[in-house]
Amino acid sequence: MNCPDCGDEQTRVIDTETSADGTSVRRRRECQRCSFRFTTYERPEWDSLQVKKRNGTIEPFNRTKLRAGIERAVEKRDVSETTVTTLVDDIESALQDRETRLVSSSLIGELVSDRLRDLDKVAYIRFVSVYKAFSEPQEFLRELDAVLNAEIDDFEAPNDSQ
Protein backbone atom coordinates (compact mmCIF):
# COMPACT_ATOMS: atom_id res chain seq x y z
CA MET A 1 0.00 0.00 0.00
CA ASN A 2 1.52 3.32 -1.08
CA CYS A 3 1.58 6.24 1.33
CA PRO A 4 -0.96 8.89 0.19
CA ASP A 5 1.37 11.65 1.48
CA CYS A 6 4.79 10.78 0.06
CA GLY A 7 4.00 7.82 -2.22
CA ASP A 8 6.48 5.44 -0.57
CA GLU A 9 5.61 1.74 -0.73
CA GLN A 10 6.85 0.92 2.77
CA THR A 11 3.89 1.15 5.16
CA ARG A 12 2.98 -0.93 8.16
CA VAL A 13 -0.37 -1.80 9.72
CA ILE A 14 -0.63 -0.46 13.28
CA ASP A 15 -4.27 -1.37 14.01
CA THR A 16 -6.93 -3.63 12.46
CA GLU A 17 -10.66 -3.72 13.25
CA THR A 18 -13.48 -5.70 11.69
CA SER A 19 -16.77 -3.84 11.27
CA ALA A 20 -19.67 -4.82 13.53
CA ASP A 21 -21.51 -6.53 10.68
CA GLY A 22 -18.37 -8.33 9.53
CA THR A 23 -18.49 -6.94 5.99
CA SER A 24 -15.37 -4.79 6.07
CA VAL A 25 -11.99 -4.39 7.73
CA ARG A 26 -10.55 -1.04 8.84
CA ARG A 27 -6.77 -0.73 9.02
CA ARG A 28 -4.66 2.13 10.42
CA ARG A 29 -1.35 2.33 8.59
CA GLU A 30 1.86 4.29 9.05
CA CYS A 31 4.40 5.20 6.40
CA GLN A 32 7.89 3.97 7.27
CA ARG A 33 9.50 6.92 5.48
CA CYS A 34 7.50 10.01 6.53
CA SER A 35 5.49 8.61 9.51
CA PHE A 36 2.19 9.76 7.93
CA ARG A 37 -0.77 7.82 9.33
CA PHE A 38 -3.81 6.93 7.26
CA THR A 39 -6.80 4.57 7.24
CA THR A 40 -7.76 1.99 4.63
CA TYR A 41 -10.93 -0.10 4.33
CA GLU A 42 -11.22 -3.54 2.81
CA ARG A 43 -14.51 -4.89 1.51
CA PRO A 44 -15.16 -8.00 -0.55
CA GLU A 45 -15.70 -7.35 -4.22
CA TRP A 46 -18.35 -9.66 -5.58
CA ASP A 47 -17.45 -11.29 -8.82
CA SER A 48 -19.97 -10.16 -11.36
CA LEU A 49 -22.25 -12.64 -13.03
CA GLN A 50 -21.38 -13.68 -16.56
CA VAL A 51 -23.94 -14.99 -19.03
CA LYS A 52 -23.09 -17.63 -21.61
CA LYS A 53 -25.32 -17.08 -24.62
CA ARG A 54 -26.59 -19.75 -27.01
CA ASN A 55 -23.92 -18.85 -29.58
CA GLY A 56 -21.19 -19.47 -26.99
CA THR A 57 -20.24 -15.85 -26.34
CA ILE A 58 -19.97 -14.64 -22.77
CA GLU A 59 -21.12 -11.22 -21.60
CA PRO A 60 -21.71 -9.54 -18.23
CA PHE A 61 -25.15 -10.04 -16.68
CA ASN A 62 -27.33 -7.10 -17.65
CA ARG A 63 -30.18 -6.34 -15.26
CA THR A 64 -31.58 -3.73 -17.67
CA LYS A 65 -31.79 -6.31 -20.44
CA LEU A 66 -33.57 -8.76 -18.12
CA ARG A 67 -36.07 -6.09 -17.10
CA ALA A 68 -36.68 -5.06 -20.73
CA GLY A 69 -37.51 -8.65 -21.69
CA ILE A 70 -39.98 -8.96 -18.83
CA GLU A 71 -41.51 -5.55 -19.58
CA ARG A 72 -42.06 -6.56 -23.22
CA ALA A 73 -43.87 -9.70 -22.07
CA VAL A 74 -46.13 -7.86 -19.60
CA GLU A 75 -46.79 -4.88 -21.88
CA LYS A 76 -50.46 -3.81 -21.72
CA ARG A 77 -51.13 -6.41 -19.01
CA ASP A 78 -52.26 -5.63 -15.48
CA VAL A 79 -48.77 -6.00 -13.99
CA SER A 80 -47.37 -3.14 -11.90
CA GLU A 81 -43.85 -1.69 -12.08
CA THR A 82 -43.38 -2.85 -8.50
CA THR A 83 -44.21 -6.41 -9.49
CA VAL A 84 -41.75 -6.25 -12.40
CA THR A 85 -39.04 -4.89 -10.08
CA THR A 86 -39.73 -7.65 -7.56
CA LEU A 87 -39.57 -10.24 -10.33
CA VAL A 88 -36.22 -8.89 -11.59
CA ASP A 89 -34.85 -8.75 -8.01
CA ASP A 90 -35.99 -12.33 -7.37
CA ILE A 91 -34.37 -13.66 -10.54
CA GLU A 92 -31.12 -11.75 -9.97
CA SER A 93 -31.01 -12.99 -6.38
CA ALA A 94 -31.53 -16.59 -7.53
CA LEU A 95 -28.62 -16.19 -9.96
CA GLN A 96 -26.35 -14.58 -7.32
CA ASP A 97 -27.10 -17.44 -4.90
CA ARG A 98 -25.63 -19.98 -7.31
CA GLU A 99 -22.12 -21.23 -6.65
CA THR A 100 -20.94 -20.39 -10.14
CA ARG A 101 -20.53 -16.88 -11.56
CA LEU A 102 -21.20 -18.16 -15.09
CA VAL A 103 -24.86 -18.79 -15.91
CA SER A 104 -26.46 -19.78 -19.19
CA SER A 105 -28.97 -17.58 -20.95
CA SER A 106 -31.25 -20.62 -21.03
CA LEU A 107 -31.23 -20.76 -17.21
CA ILE A 108 -32.25 -17.10 -17.08
CA GLY A 109 -34.99 -17.81 -19.62
CA GLU A 110 -36.29 -20.71 -17.52
CA LEU A 111 -36.32 -18.60 -14.35
CA VAL A 112 -38.25 -15.83 -16.13
CA SER A 113 -40.73 -18.20 -17.77
CA ASP A 114 -41.39 -20.09 -14.51
CA ARG A 115 -42.21 -16.86 -12.70
CA LEU A 116 -44.27 -15.42 -15.56
CA ARG A 117 -46.30 -18.64 -15.79
CA ASP A 118 -47.40 -18.08 -12.18
CA LEU A 119 -47.88 -14.34 -12.62
CA ASP A 120 -49.69 -13.88 -15.94
CA LYS A 121 -50.41 -16.58 -18.53
CA VAL A 122 -50.52 -14.17 -21.49
CA ALA A 123 -47.16 -12.64 -20.51
CA TYR A 124 -45.78 -16.17 -20.14
CA ILE A 125 -46.90 -17.14 -23.67
CA ARG A 126 -45.45 -13.92 -25.08
CA PHE A 127 -42.13 -14.54 -23.36
CA VAL A 128 -41.72 -18.22 -24.27
CA SER A 129 -42.71 -17.62 -27.88
CA VAL A 130 -39.60 -15.43 -28.18
CA TYR A 131 -37.39 -17.33 -25.70
CA LYS A 132 -38.09 -20.72 -27.29
CA ALA A 133 -37.93 -19.15 -30.77
CA PHE A 134 -41.12 -20.72 -32.08
CA SER A 135 -40.80 -21.08 -35.83
CA GLU A 136 -44.08 -22.86 -36.53
CA PRO A 137 -47.62 -22.05 -35.37
CA GLN A 138 -47.94 -25.63 -34.07
CA GLU A 139 -45.20 -24.98 -31.50
CA PHE A 140 -47.08 -21.94 -30.27
CA LEU A 141 -50.33 -23.93 -30.09
CA ARG A 142 -48.67 -26.78 -28.15
CA GLU A 143 -47.38 -24.33 -25.53
CA LEU A 144 -50.76 -22.60 -25.33
CA ASP A 145 -52.45 -26.00 -25.00
CA ALA A 146 -50.13 -26.91 -22.10
CA VAL A 147 -50.98 -23.66 -20.30
CA LEU A 148 -54.72 -24.11 -20.85
CA ASN A 149 -54.64 -27.76 -19.73
CA ALA A 150 -52.71 -26.83 -16.58
CA GLU A 151 -55.30 -24.13 -15.87
CA ILE A 152 -58.16 -26.63 -16.32
CA ASP A 153 -56.39 -29.13 -14.04
CA ASP A 154 -55.98 -26.41 -11.39
CA PHE A 155 -59.64 -25.49 -11.70
CA GLU A 156 -60.86 -29.10 -11.44
CA ALA A 157 -58.53 -30.12 -8.60
CA PRO A 158 -60.52 -31.42 -5.61
CA ASN A 159 -60.58 -29.28 -2.51
CA ASP A 160 -59.12 -31.34 0.35
CA SER A 161 -60.04 -28.79 3.00
CA GLN A 162 -63.71 -29.84 3.08
Curated annotation (Swiss-Prot):
Cofactor note: Binds 1 zinc ion.
GO molecular function: ATP binding; DNA binding; zinc ion binding
Keywords on record: ATP-binding, DNA-binding, Metal-binding, Nucleotide-binding, Repressor, Transcription, Transcription regulation, Zinc, Zinc-finger
Keyword Transcription regulation in annotation: yes
Region Disordered: start-end pairs: 1-21
UniProt cross-references to InterPro entries, sorted A to Z: ATP-cone_dom, NrdR-like_N, RNR_NrdR-like
Record Pfam families: ATP-cone, Zn_ribbon_NrdR
UniProt cofactor(s): Zn(2+)
Domain ATP-cone residues, every copy: 49-139
Zinc fingers (unnamed) by residue: 3-34
GO biological process: negative regulation of DNA-templated transcription
Keyword hit for Metal-binding: yes
Function per UniProt: Negatively regulates transcription of bacterial ribonucleotide reductase nrd genes and operons by binding to NrdR-boxes.
Protein family (similarity comment): Belongs to the NrdR family.
Protein name, entry field: Transcriptional repressor NrdR
